[in-house]
Regions:
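Signal peptide processing junction and immediate N-terminal pro/mature segment
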Residues: 29-33
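Beta-strand/loop edge motif enriched in small/polar residues
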Residues: 271-812, 822-893, 899-960, 970
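Bacterial N-terminal signal peptides that target proteins for export
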Residues: 2-19
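Residues that cap or anchor secondary-structure elements
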Residues: 34-323, 330
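Bacterial N-terminal signal peptides
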Residues: 16-28
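Proline-centered structural pivot motif
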Residues: 642-644, 908, 945-960, 970-1005, ...
Length: 1009
């Protein structure tokens, strides 16, 4: 039954625009009219925290301030007293070149042939000593010496770069050593083909490998992780604690042609330790063929042509000339220049691995300004914004465990430094070209299968890259948007699943794939001329393309399988509909609907049935009569539409004004806003929002869903408000009221869920008569709560506050019960003579927690994971040092207690009964036992501390329906006391209203298409 008739009166557009200007003047900060100062307030080995202060403007006299974190591996080094910015260059002093202004220290000898000519000290003080020895070809058990290192003198040719010309006998080659703030690199630089044809050594070019041997005389203890590859090949990741050697590459100096993988092995031969890099001749030769056959006659060529062959590595090592074992020729470094003629390079890098754990925190903006690596546990929280500087090296590489915590309306967004549409405005806002190299580079060696979902990448050279994800531990990219990048996805040596991904405005969708199994479903590829491009043989990889839309993206040269895919070439200009910042909806009358015929992954299908290809409805003007909004766009519950699906938006608004009427939201409706305020409650208005336990109403910023900035929308740095109550001239009688249940708020981090605090604009400017928030989720942002009269009430019951915070002050009555305040800030200013109550809540890692004004009435609260506490300490509080939560298959959210016990957990520790708390049909347990049925301890009538989820059926995954009449218990027994006699407006959850008894519920979903 509708709460109100669906009627909407629209005032003229001029008045609406005045309202928008008012909100912008109040909240929006115009960066162009401000002076900006930056201060570094914290430094670490790989990061710095920057505070930004923007001066005031006539519209915002107070100005603006914010903070961001800049990341780059090796950004600083510790000089014994403080962190200093790294300066990766060599100080050249006679026989030595020393780089000591980085966390790792490098020393090179002028004559590379001397023993221990290359020395590296890792950030943790471990020493690595080595020198290159020779190149050899191998085919099966046969090995042939190609060239030995000879006396050669180093030249400083530029900041951080030393070159040893004429480094080998018999071939025209050099060795280059580069020091950077994040690592150290050796390049073997080949100038022509002389002496490098495997056929000259009686070896099969299809099976031979070229090897570069280096002797390691001292090294930290290593940990080697095998990386199984295609065709029974294996590479290893070699970790030395704070530094590691990853897979190298062979490539042309001009950047054209493929990057050929360089494999490694590391260990002892004949009692000595060697690092051996190898490259397959069949791929490597296509690089060498781009070089001239000969550059200049080599006086030692005749010796090389003698072709020495060996059947064991020991025999080969024994044959080396004494000069290569130990050289004593005196030499000094000199300055030189690098001849930038075409060459082929074989490289390896010893890089800092940053084993520390890291969190990309929801609500924060990060700037990746150089190569950034993590090998500890890296956590990505939905709502984090990761920006990249525009240079050739800004990248994010992960080789350790990944915890990916993103969800619908909480994507992880990776974009350019100059993109001010999201996150804090840390640059000019003038976008040009592509920024990061590999925006997200994921290595799967030794890791379990990984699901990356709800991700958006913009303005990268390559958006996502993966390597070493096998059939047993595949990498899945799901529900992602990749826009305005050079390349979308690059996969090597592994199994990759790319599902429900939008790729638009790219140069190529899939690039440089190599020995990859790529299984795609529900792709939309648009404004992208090439579906694939690789300089390797495409036949060594396989493609499956199911239920996808390839619009004007050439698949020439690619053989793929799959079903339900529409390929249009040249591209259609009418295939998609655009609304707001979403440019890839299907028109409602599209003939493509329901044409996705392929059988797809079960979980992917379940997700898509909750998503849509239909653009939202647009709501403009002002609500003047009681109005109810329900879902308006079609969820894909019947035969699947092909192509990428969006997380649904039902109604797109700039700012929705509500005056003298009640706005109702129901049944999981989603409202997205583009302005600085979402819903503006004016005099005489009310908001009544009630979703469903398993399908909550949502109020969100449009950027949480749509891939591009919308015309006229405010930027990411604007402080926005989902529900705004700023009004002049209101009294308690005409003040707005807010009543929300089963409603999720996503206004953007640093913004407001609800702004009702008194202060700005007069004593009653933000006055509200009543705020009731129950069973709601607040992600990021602030709940700013206040009223300047004791007749007003604010009641918070059983809500989740995820990061962000709560600020409350004023004269109203206030209570908070059964909250989970997770990593949130709490600020409370209670009026004199008040009885503000805080009971049965869990404060998890909250900081800061500040309180001023009158004393609070608080007891029976849980403080876990180091959370700060309300003061003074209360006798019945629970303080638990380590507490965690769980998700469960078929459950609602990942907030069930892993320790649901009385002895050590939060079970039955509350201040009142579950009936008084209204949580009879809720639970904190993974087993879905509702409070009313839980007899696990002697005090089982007492409510469990903290946030509860509605108990669901373990067979259907839907909220429990005891009497099987199709109405959930929690909706029939609205006050949640499980009383035998229902209260007014309730029905008995034990007795079927339909007369069906207690049989399993028959749930009828009317297809919306």
């Amino acid at each position: 039954m509708n709460m109100f008739p669906l009627r909407l009166l629209v005032r003229n557009a001029f008045e609406g625009s005045l309202m928008a200007v008012f909100v912008l003047c109040l909240l929006h900060v115009s960066a162009s009219a401000q002076e900006t100062t930056q201060e570094i307030v914290q430094r670490g080995a790989h990061h710095r925290v920057v505070d930004v202060v923007q001066s005031g403007t006539p519209e915002n006299p107070a100005g603006n301030s914010f903070r961001y974190t800049e990341l780059a591996t090796g950004m600083h080094y510790w000089d014994g007293t403080e962190w200093k910015a790294s300066d990766p260059d060599y100080d050249v002093n006679g026989p030595l070149a020393v780089a000591h202004r980085t966390a790792h220290k490098v020393t090179l000898k002028a004559n590379l042939a001397e023993e221990d000519s290359v020395q590296v000290v890792t950030p943790d003080g471990q020493e690595f000593r080595a020198r290159p020895l020779f190149l050899a070809y191998r085919d099966g058990t046969n090995v042939a010496l190609v060239a030995e290192l000879k006396d050669c003198v180093g030249e400083w040719i530029g900041p951080g770069v030393v070159l040893y010309n004429a480094a080998f006998d018999g071939i025209n080659a050099a060795i280059r050593y580069s020091v950077t703030q994040f690592g150290f690199e050796q390049d073997v630089v080949l100038y022509d083909q002389q002496g490098l044809n495997p056929a000259d050594y009686l070896m099969n070019p299809e099976s031979a490998t070229l090897e570069c041997w280096s002797e390691v005389t001292q090294a930290p203890q290593s940990q080697q992780t095998a990386q199984p590859l295609a065709n029974q090949e294996t590479d290893v990741l070699i970790n030395f604690g704070t530094m590691e050697i990853r897979q190298g590459a062979a490539f042309t100096s001009t950047g054209d042609g493929p990057q050929v993988p360089v494999f490694k092995r590391y260990g002892q031969v004949a009692g000595k330790t060697f690092l051996v890099e190898s490259v397959k001749s069949r791929e490597f030769w296509q690089l060498l063929e781009t070089l001239p056959e000969f550059s200049e006659p080599n006086p030692e060529e005749a010796r090389v042509r003698k072709k020495r062959f060996f059947s064991t590595d020991q025999a080969l090592l024994a044959s080396l000339s004494p000069r290569a074992r130990k050289a004593t020729t005196a030499a000094t470094f000199r300055r030189g220049t690098f001849d930038r003629k075409r060459a082929v390079v074989i490289d390896y890098q010893l890089v800092q691995s940053n084993p520390n754990n890291w969190v990309f925190t929801a609500g924060e903006t990060f700037l990746v300004s150089g190569p950034t690596t993590f090998s500890g546990v890296t956590r990505f929280e939905g709502g984090s914004i990761i920006k990249f500087s525009k240079n050739v090296s800004a990248s994010l590489s992960i080789s350790g465990p990944v915890v990916w915590d993103a969800a619908p309306y909480r994507p992880v967004i990776m974009t350019a430094r100059d993109d001010n549409s999201v996150g804090q405005p840390i640059s000019t806002g003038t976008l040009s070209g592509n920024y990061s190299t590999d925006c997200l580079n994921l290595t799967g060696s030794g890791q379990p299968a990984l699901l990356i979902q709800h991700l958006r990448v913009s303005h990268a050279q390559t958006a996502v890259r993966g390597q070493y994800w096998g059939a047993s531990n595949p990498l899945t990219i799901r529900h992602a948007q990749i826009v305005n990048c050079g390349a979308g996805f690059r996969g090597e040596f592994g199994t990759y699943r790319v599902q429900n991904v939008l790729m638009s405005g790219l140069g190529v969708a899939f690039s440089a794939y190599y020995y990859a199994t790529i299984q795609t479903a529900h792709l939309t590829v648009n404004s992208t001329p090439l579906f694939h491009q690789t300089t390797y043989n495409p036949s060594v990889s396989t493609f499956v393309v199911d239920n996808s839309l390839l619009n004007g993206s050439s698949t020439s040269g690619l053989t793929y399988t799959g079903a339900g895919t529409t390929y249009t070439y040249p591209g259609s200009t009418t295939m998609f509909a655009t609304l707001g910042g979403g440019g890839h909806y299907l028109p409602k009358t599209s003939g493509l609907r329901n044409s996705g015929t392929a059988t797809i992954d079960t979980q992917l299908k379940a997700d898509l049935q909750r998503m849509t290809t239909e653009p939202p409805s647009v709501l403009a003007g002002e609500v003047l009569l009681d109005t109810e909004l329900a879902p308006s766009v079609q969820r894909d519950t019947d035969a699947l539409d092909p192509g990428a699906h969006y997380v649904p938006i039902d109604w797109l608004v700039s700012t929705l004004n509500v005056t003298g009427s009640t706005l109702g939201l129901k049944d999981g409706v989603v409202i997205a806003f583009t302005n600085a305020a979402g819903i503006w409650l004016k005099a005489g208005s009310a908001l009544k929002s009630e979703g469903l336990p398993h399908r909550m109403n949502v109020i969100t910023r449009y950027t949480a869903v749509q891939e591009s900035p919308a015309a006229g929308a405010v930027g990411g740095g604007t402080v926005a408000t989902a529900i705004y109550t700023g009004n002049t001239g209101v009294s308690l009688a005409t003040a707005p009221a807010v009543d929300c249940r089963f409603t999720a708020f996503h206004p953007g981090y640093g913004s407001y869920h609800l702004f009702t605090s008194d202060g700005v604009g007069g004593a009653s400017f933000y006055l509200t008569k009543a705020v009731k928030l129950r069973d709601c989720h607040f992600y990021g942002g602030l709940l700013s709560l206040g009223a300047n009269t004791a007749s007003a009430t604010v009641e918070l019951n059983n809500n989740l506050v995820y990061r962000g915070g709560i600020v409350c002050g004023g004269l109203m009555n206030f209570s908070m019960r059964n909250h989970l305040n997770w990593r949130a800030s709490i600020s409370v200013t209670a009026p004199a003579g008040s009885a503000w109550g805080f009971h049965d809540n869990v404060f998890d890692g909250c900081s800061p927690v500040t309180q001023t004004g009158a004393a609070l009435i608080h007891n029976y609260n849980g403080y876990v994971n180091g959370s700060l506490r309300l003061t003074p300490s209360a006798a019945n509080d629970r303080v638990i040092a380590s507490f965690s939560y769980a998700s469960v298959s078929g459950g609602l959210e990942p907030w069930y207690h892993t320790d649901a016990t009385y002895a050590t957990g939060l079970l039955d520790r509350g201040s009142q009964t579950w009936a008084a708390a209204g949580l009879a049909h809720h639970t904190v347990k993974t087993g879905q036992v509702p409070e009313r049925s839980d007899a696990s301890s002697g005090s089982s009538t007492l409510v469990d501390m903290g946030f509860h989820l509605v108990a669901v059926s373990t067979s259907t995954g839907l909220p429990v329906d005891t009497d099987g009449d199709g109405f959930f218990d929690v909706m029939e027994d609205r006050n949640g006391d499980a009383a035998t006699t229902p209260s007014s407006g309730e029905s008995d959850f034990n007795v079927s209203e339909s007369g069906l008894g207690g049989s399993a519920p028959l749930l009828v979903f009317t297809p919306l298409k």
